[in-house]
Structures are given as structure tokens and as C-alpha cells.
């Protein structure tokens, strides 16, 4: 399983993010989830919002990553104006 996770440094506007979700759900073969970061083990959390894409395998991820839908989600995320980072992980049992 492959997961792309997005960590936003600030709060996102809920109405604007709802528009972003429509683009994210159009990425082929991916599950998409998102939500507010509400805490950390010690102190305040470094991030305020979290989103993730999930693909069943590396081939599905590679195919989606080459597509225009995935690229559009990145452009749209940048247009929201909230600093964020993206990382990719390969998960195993």
C-alpha cells in the first residue's frame, strides 16, 4: 500500500477546502481522507490539517502520479496559500 500524506502548517478555509476535495477525489485509483489535527503528545501540534491519498500498490501510485488530476491537486493546494509538505510512504503489514 502506498500513502501520500499532506501536512498543512495552518488552518484551511473549510469552504475553499471543500473545492479542493472535489479535485482530490478525481485522482485515479486513490482513496482520499482529510481532517483537522487536534493535538500532539507534548505541546501544540506542528500542523493544523492533514490529508492523505492511498493506493493499493506502487504501480497504481505511479500511474496516478503521472496523471493530470494529481498534478492539479498540487497546484490547487499551493493556490490556497497555506504552507504544506507532502511525503510518500510504502506501508507493509
Stretches found by the model and what they are:
Residues 24-28, 70-75, 81:
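A common structural junction motif
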Residues 1-66, 87-93:
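Short S/T/G/P-rich N-terminal loop/turn motif that feeds into the first structured element of a domain
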Residues 80, 86-87:
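Helix-adjacent hinge/juxtasegments
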Amino acid at each position: 500500500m502506498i500513502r501520500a500524506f499532506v501536512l498543512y502548517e495552518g488552518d484551511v478555509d473549510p469552504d475553499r477546502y471543500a473545492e479542493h476535495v472535489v479535485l482530490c477525489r478525481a485522482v485515479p485509483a486513490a482513496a482520499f481522507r482529510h481532517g483537522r489535527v487536534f493535538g500532539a503528545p507534548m505541546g501544540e501540534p506542528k500542523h493544523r490539517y492533514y490529508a492523505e491519498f492511498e493506493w493499493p500498490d506502487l504501480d497504481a501510485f505511479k500511474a496516478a502520479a503521472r496523471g493530470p488530476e494529481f498534478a492539479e491537486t498540487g497546484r490547487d493546494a499551493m493556490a490556497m496559500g497555506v504552507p504544506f509538505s507532502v511525503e510518500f510512504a510504502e506501508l507493509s503489514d
